[in-house]
């Protein structure tokens, strides 16, 4: 995809070379990391635009710098489009990331030392939901809830017992490796019973909500955060939504000046483009296909004897428990990488292995679905994964990885990215 900016990079061979090789990697490998996707050329163009030159502290119509009339149009468009997508009366599109969005909510609603609850990282939550090494785990009294060992589904009874015992000011739900629908109404009832606010982090499934294949938490929670990449297929960034005007005022102040200075206007421009794309009818089909593909992949692996955490998926991701195969997540990630299948090692609930090793892998469908993969292709991908991992540690390992790599090459050639067919 050569263009003006690529040509300009010829004067910096180090960066130009790295970008070219990364483009080659993305074109020639099947991306199965659940948090990654393939943005459109329009999103790339917006993020690489002159909007990056503009400082714009403040909000549309209320900036601390002159010359903001055009960035105001861009940010207003992003806000309007997000509000339409998620039925939200208030949207802040300035957070630089999902972690920044979550931090802004905590700054808005909590004081240091306050108690809040979040799904534990070990159960599929996110670092920012109270993991000890993070700001959320150090500045606040973070009480973690988990999943049942019997089925790896959220233990709502445990959540309720802990909420009654600790009286949190905020209950957070959502996660980074939880493949099932969450009972938002049950958590809302628990939060109401103890006087807590409810926050949903929909970073992973925002695109599914936008596409109408997942319940909309904005209708239930006091406040919702998300990233704009992953299933939403936009640039890397964050966003906060609510229909509670009291919360909205606190959030705006928490984002700026509380947590951030100038917003990244080139990224907000790209967010606006991606949100516009998500309003189109074909995005709804894309969302449906992500879920159908994830279920096809889960079924293909189950047929080959692989254990899928929780028994399946309702979303774009699956978590594979490799213990019965005697393979670590680390070794699986490396072997699949050699075969051109990019994924990440991931802890499973009640994982006996350390985080740098893990007993599982996380697989997602957003990027390959953007390439055009459907169920048939994901059935093939599931077979390739099983072939590689079944042979791992045997004398057939190298040959299976080579064969898988050839199949990956053929699939990528049939479904190219950033070409005339994209």
UniProtKB/Swiss-Prot annotation:
Q: Which GO terms describe its biological process?
A: glycine biosynthetic process from serine; tetrahydrofolate interconversion
Q: Which domain of life is it from?
A: Bacteria
Annotated site, Plays an important role in substrate specificity, chain positions: 229
Q: Where in the cell is it found?
A: Cytoplasm
* Assigned EC number: 2.1.2.1
Gene3D superfamilies reported in the protein's UniProt record = Aspartate Aminotransferase, domain 1, Type I PLP-dependent aspartate aminotransferase-like (Major domain)
Q: Which UniProt keywords apply?
A: Amino-acid biosynthesis, Cytoplasm, One-carbon metabolism, Plasmid, Pyridoxal phosphate, Transferase
The record, for Pfam families, names:
SHMT
Gene Ontology, cellular component aspect:
cytosol
- Which residues are annotated as modified residue N6-(pyridoxal phosphate)lysine in the UniProt record? 230
**Cited InterPro entries:** PyrdxlP-dep_Trfase (IPR015424), PyrdxlP-dep_Trfase_major (IPR015421), PyrdxlP-dep_Trfase_small (IPR015422), Ser_HO-MeTrfase (IPR001085), Ser_HO-MeTrfase-like (IPR049943), Ser_HO-MeTrfase_PLP_BS (IPR019798), SHMT-like_dom (IPR039429)
The chemistry this enzyme catalyses reads:
(6R)-5,10-methylene-5,6,7,8-tetrahydrofolate + glycine + H2O = (6S)-5,6,7,8-tetrahydrofolate + L-serine
GO molecular function (one) = pyridoxal phosphate binding
Give the metabolic or biological pathway. One-carbon metabolism; tetrahydrofolate interconversion; Amino-acid biosynthesis; glycine biosynthesis; glycine from L-serine: step 1/1
- Which cysteine residues pair off into disulfide bonds? none
User: So which cofactors does this thing need?
Assistant: pyridoxal 5'-phosphate
| Record-listed (6S)-5,6,7,8-tetrahydrofolate binding positions | 121, 125-127
Q: Outline the subunit composition.
A: Homodimer.
Q: Which family does it belong to?
A: Belongs to the SHMT family.
Q: Describe its function.
A: Catalyzes the reversible interconversion of serine and glycine with tetrahydrofolate (THF) serving as the one-carbon carrier. This reaction serves as the major source of one-carbon groups required for the biosynthesis of purines, thymidylate, methionine, and other important biomolecules. Also exhibits THF-independent aldolase activity toward beta-hydroxyamino acids, producing glycine and aldehydes, via a retro-aldol mechanism.
Per its UniProt record, what NCBIfam families does this chain match?
PRK00011.1 (NF000586)
PANTHER family for the chain: SERINE HYDROXYMETHYLTRANSFERASE, SERINE HYDROXYMETHYLTRANSFERASE 1
User: This chain belongs to which protein, by name?
Assistant: Serine hydroxymethyltransferase 2
What species is this protein from?
Rhizobium meliloti (strain 1021)
Its gene? glyA2
